Design a protein with these regions (language model features):
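Helix-hairpin-helix
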Residues: 448-460, 465-494
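Long, highly charged low-complexity segments enriched in Glu/Asp and Lys/Arg with interspersed Ser/Thr
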Residues: 407-418, 492-505
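C-terminal accessory region of SF2 helicases/translocases
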Residues: 285, 302-307, 311-320, 325-450
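Intrinsically disordered, low-complexity N-terminal extensions of nucleic-acid-metabolism proteins
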Residues: 1-2, 116, 504-509
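C-terminal extensions
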Residues: 445-449, 463, 502-509
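Helicase motor core with emphasis on the C-terminal RecA-like subdomain
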Residues: 3-4, 8-17, 21-25, 29-51, ...
């Protein structure tokens, strides 16, 4: 069946800028709805490609696409990713000086940007509202849309500014909302508070089959952590701690054991946080030890494990953080190390939280009740003898088998081997040297461009190159993630490295 013209154009742009020949999951459904002028809500797991759903329409629609995003680091990473894909974008947040902010607005008026990321707090300022009323806005995309819900794990009152902002625009744009973690109650809140009009709703499922979940209750957490990390010494991983103090202790523990680690929490100077994040993204350190301040917007595909050294406050936070493992589709492990003190720490944070307290004592009491209910669900996860994957999916309202056969609890019961899909095999020994060469070339490009290596080519793309050894442009363009733009910018150099390696091996043989 012949594709309709807008979707055909969308697919061409997907290939040109991102190097993929077809859409995944609900991407096509949501993009088609947005292009037809329909509001949309996408509930898609981490790594499912939510940003594609508004970036591709953003390139096709006549006006500007505004993306409402909650964190400065998230916006900056997204704009860097656009740049790597050959797309001009900008962000408007408090990291800009007033002069830089005015210049960005002026450039936007001149049509230099198709996609602009903006903080929700910015929507209520008169200067930004005047700007928004003076330019054509075709689409407003809301990232991390669960932040609008008081039932969510990360309620942000500033997200309540979005619907009034859209209502004051001269012409109502298409409104699209996206999140990775939303229970049925949170979905209803998103629909209500954002005032989505007859939206296309796509819930693609929360199941990440490549993730292996396990809960341990060790008598010695430090020893358990060291044993686990030692087993994954050559792999990238994240260790989440509930407090800054624990981040410091765990970082010191790992370093004293000869493991390269960086730390990240809100109490550090911005420069140290940035240096640590960069070192992790560039694979200069293997382990990032962090509070929940780290992770949102960090587009690192090859994280092989996530360890929670402390139990999080709720399932939403746990699954979002655990979901930062295995974004390249390869097998990855999500380990939670439970201790009785974790509950007391979580209770302390809930009792002392100020989020959502603007409504007075009654609102505070209601918010705390919600948070304590969520904490109970989190504790139940740690103590269930049933399937961990089923527990997670059931929490988010998704049907699943009572046993997945491939989590810590199921394996303990059934003693079966993992049967996880592995779309791209990791390089065998014969390809390992070529793979390491390609990683070195990628790092050179990344450092010169000031981009994380994964934005040049993902590990999966490099693995595919090492396995298939493309010998010409046509072969290179068959590699997932090699777009025409990226081939011109980087691919020719990678091709020469592969060809030289092949010639050298032929000479030896």
């Amino acid at each position: 069946m012949q594709r309709n013209e807008p979707l055909g154009q969308a697919q061409a742009l997907l290939y040109e800028h991102f190097g993929y020949s077809s859409f995944r999951g609900a991407q096509e459904t949501l993009i088609s709805a947005i292009l037809s002028g329909k509001d949309a809500l996408g509930i898609m797991p981490t790594g499912a490609g939510k940003s594609i759903c508004y970036q591709i329409p953003g390139l096709m629609l006549p006006g500007i696409t505004l993306v409402v995003s909650p964190l400065i680091s998230l916006m900056q990473d997204q704009v860097r990713a656009l740049k790597a894909a050959g797309i001009a974008g900008a962000y408007l947040n408090s990291s800009l000086s007033y002069k830089q902010y005015l210049r960005a607005l002026d450039n936007a008026r001149k049509g230099m940007y198709k996609i602009i990321y903006v903080a929700p707090e910015r929507l209520v300022t008169g200067e930004f509202q005047s700007f928004a009323a003076s330019v054509p806005i075709s689409l407003v995309a809301v990232d991390e849309a669960h932040c609008v819900s008081q039932w969510g794990h990360d309620f942000r009152p500033s997200y309540m500014n979005i619907a009034p902002f859209v209502a004051m625009l001269p012409t109502r744009p298409v409104l699209a909302a996206f999140t990775a973690t939303a229970t049925p109650a949170v979905r209803e809140d998103i629909l209500c508070h954002l005032k989505l009009q007859n939206p296309e709703i796509a819930v693609t499922g929360f199941n990440r089959e490549n993730l292996f979940f396990r809960v341990l209750k060790p008598t010695d957490k430090k020893a358990a952590l060291l044993e686990f990390v030692a087993q994954h010494r050559d792999e990238s991983g994240i260790v989440y701690c509930s407090t800054r103090k624990n981040v410091e202790k765990v970082t010191e523990l790992l370093k004293d054991s000869g493991i390269s680690a960086a730390r990240y929490h809100a109490g550090l100077e911005e420069e140290e946080r940035r240096e640590g994040q960069t070192a992790f993204l560039y694979d200069k350190v293997k382990v990032m030890v962090a509070t929940n301040a780290f992770g949102m917007g960090i587009d690192k595909q090859n994280v092989s494990y996530v360890v929670h050294y402390n139990m999080p406050k709720n399932m939403e936070a746990y699954y979002q953080e655990a979901g930062r493992a295995g974004r390249d589709g390869s097998k990855a492990e999500c380990l939670l190390l439970y201790g009785a003190g974790d509950v007391r720490t979580a209770e302390f944070f809930i009792n002392n939280s100020t989020e959502g307290n603007e409504g007075g004592p009654q609102a505070i009491a209601q918010r705390r009740k919600i948070e304590f209910d969520k904490l109970d669900q989190m504790k139940n996860y740690c103590f269930t003898s049933g399937c961990l994957r089923h527990y997670i999916l059931d929490y988010f309202g998704e049907d699943s088998p009572l046993s997945c056969g491939n989590c810590g609890n199921c394996r303990a019961k059934k003693r079966i081997a993992a049967t996880l899909a592995k779309p791209v095999s990791r390089p065998q020994k014969t390809e390992r040297s070529l793979y390491e060469m390609l990683r070195s070339v990628r790092l050179d490009f990344a450092e010169k461009a000031g981009l994380p290596p994964e934005l040049i080519f993902t590990d999966r793309s490099l693995q595919a190159m090492a396995v298939t050894k493309p010998q010409n442009e046509h072969d290179m363009m068959e590699i997932p993630g090699v777009s025409p733009v990226k081939y011109q910018m980087y691919g020719k150099t990678f091709l020469r490295v592969i060809q030289r390696n092949s010639d050298r091996r032929s000479g030896v043989e």
